[in-house]
Amino acid sequence: MLTEIRNCNIPKMKRYDHLFEKICDIENLRKAHKNAKKGKGWYKEVQEIDKDPDKYLEQIQEMLINHTYRTSEYEVFYKDDGRKKRKIYKLPYFPDRICQWAILQVIEPCIINNLTTDTYSAIPDRGIHKALHKMQDAMWNHPEECKYCLKLDARHYYQSINHDLLKEKYSRMFNDSELVWLLTEIIDSIQTADIEDLTAIYLLEEDVDPETGIPIGNYLSQYSGNFYFSSFDHWIKEQKHIRYYFRYMDDIVIFAKTKEELVELRKEIDVYFRDELKLNIKGNWQVFPTF
């Protein structure tokens, strides 16, 4: 019988407040410009802003404080990563990329503090190599408990992230209406892209709901994508008591003693994905022996 998911007693998320004023602080904006322009000094936009940085940064500050900031139109292009073509969304350097850096410089510690130690994507000092090392360490040092592996990921993950649910998650973490306004503006900004291009995208993506999706390429998106899964991480670790669990964005690996327990767990994960995250498991999930 599947576990009751909605009534599970997951610890309350820590809430943070008074962050918007830190984002708008001119020193934070100066730092954001410094970080955002790394490796991009040849950009015409960067060179223009560098002639009088504070003039432009004060414009961003005014947009934020007055709530007149609106996400610019996206440039959409395709990138072949060797397995498939991915749609990448690119925003102008000014004001958008500076703005997103200013946000992440303040909220990144809050997001990371909410994640378990079992997730490795978009986190400083973790990454794919550390994830692989941890998996290898588990298999070699605890072979009896890691005889079988469940491997799965979400179908069309970035395209399927539900806007309302993501905004709700941020609202639970940030007791700051102005910060929530700013995050909402960026989360919903995919609707400001070219309508014809969006229509083509959704036709290509079959049953992708046009009310969902965050843009691959946005600096904020990689953190939002990681944060969206945080409740699942806590459920797996604290309610299901899964010891050998590893997540890199939506790619999930779980080790266990028997095939049967992983098959049963996969059924429960399927329910959690649908009911709590509004996602679907991709059809190529596997359970297989590790040795």
Which residues does each PLM region occupy?
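Conserved polymerase palm-domain catalytic core
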Residues: 138-249, 253-268, 283-290
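A common structural junction motif
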Residues: 270-279
